[in-house]
Amino acid sequence: MAVMKIKGAATVAGTWLNEAVSFVVFCILDIVDSFLCLLYKAADYLFEAEWKPCYCLSDKEPITTTRGKILLSHNNGESKILTLSPLQELGGRSKIELEDISETLYTRPSLISDISTISVNELNKRFVKVTRSESECSGHNEKTKNKRRRSLTKSSLTVNFTVVEMLRGKIRPQNLNHDISRWSDCDCGFCTSWASTSDKNHSLFVKTQIPNGVTAKEDVLFIHGFISSSAFWTETVFPSLSASSSTHRLFAVDLLGFGKSPKPADSLYTLREHVEMIEKSVLHKYNVKSFHIVAHSLGCILALSLAARHGGLIKSLTLLAPPYYPVPKGEKKPRQYVMKKVAPRKVWPPIALGASMACWYEHISRTICLLICKHHRVWQFIAGVLTRNNRTVNFLIEGFMCHTHNAAWHTLHNIICGTGSKLDTYLDIVRDKLKCNVTIFHGGDDELIPVECSYNVKQRIPRARVKVIEHKDHITMVVGRQDEFARELQEIWKTSSC
């Protein structure tokens, strides 16, 4: 009993210590990010002779016209996109729609501001309770005043010109040959290989594995996760699914902005862009009629979107560590809610610190990319010396470092945070309109995406089968047990084909 009390006290003390240290650290990071904002504006002008807009806010006076550009509304202190007029073509791809752009890109309150808002809201609730009886006496007059205030609020709309300039630059017709890389991005042959290919349409990089000597019976699409690449599959599962013994045609893509795929500097990396590039580069190009999907982490969101769009073609869904955080009913800011789940602004565990820095701080995350991604060849060389060119370490580093900050930043916000409220719809479509098998794998020691996310998916899709792999994390659920995982996949495909 005494031991249990000591452990409980230690847990509480550890939690409070984590909260206190996190508060101090992230308050400092708020200041550092603001300083880096000014530094990068000067550096961009120095190296590129152009002021590059960012998502830092600078409120301006309300106006009532946008002259056919981008309009932002102001509601309870939160700015959000109200309309885009006219919708512009994205170099042959479909038009940007409102729901494609997550407000978490430009509405990320500082920690002090966030805590202040919560405190003020709580005080307001208590004040309302105390003064309720008094307000009832003068209710009629107050209602009249409120109506007038609402009418005044509705008559004016706040435009944040910083965000307008950022989005205006992003939605212009894309020229994938322009601004191949920024000064803070890597310009090596590997990272810019897409720009030197003969493919004028700039499709995604796709690694294929075709059966030897036999006609492929079925197709399988592999989608990697965030800051990764197709090597996550081709260096692990593909060799275990030998071309000499397999009857499946395998496709592993590098997502837009990652690996060897195009990294357009003026893309918003929305869900629609990612999905349509997969459709163009795999489904249309290789004439795929029906297929299985295997997706990891962020790739699960794209897989569910594809399933919703091509329900009749999906033979099975295999999801690994799906980042599904159900948004409570009545939540006014679903994307903000998901962002705080993904990046809780905590220093412990370390993976939470990394996720928080990548998600909350545009300029700190750009600095990380400058130090790591731009110089990935140096880090790969050092890792090769230390590990004696370990193949697994090499491809993991390649996938982790070969992307641009623009791609990672927008993909994180527009896909993981921005689709929080959409996933319910996708899951309902899979549950009600698709008959394919749904299998979910999750590492028992995964600290990046909790196991609860997989069980949340099962609650939405009761027929889904969840398998928790004990003592494995977000990566080692595949890496290190690829032979076993390949056998599990073959069994899933065999069962789904019956």
Curated annotation (Swiss-Prot):
It is found in: Cell membrane; Secreted, Cell wall. The gene is BDG3. The active site is at H224, S297, D446, H474. Involved in cuticle development and morphogenesis. It comes from Arabidopsis thaliana (Mouse-ear cress). This is Probable lysophospholipase BODYGUARD 3. Its main location: membrane. It comes from the Eukaryota. The keyword Signal applies. Keywords: Cell membrane, Cell wall, Cell wall biogenesis/degradation, Hydrolase, Lipoprotein, Membrane, Palmitate, Secreted, Signal. A lipid is attached at C56 (N-palmitoyl cysteine). GO terms for molecular function: hydrolase activity. Residues 1-55 form the signal peptide. Residues 220-326 form the AB hydrolase-1 domain. GO terms for cellular component: extracellular region; plasma membrane. GO terms for biological process: cell wall organization.
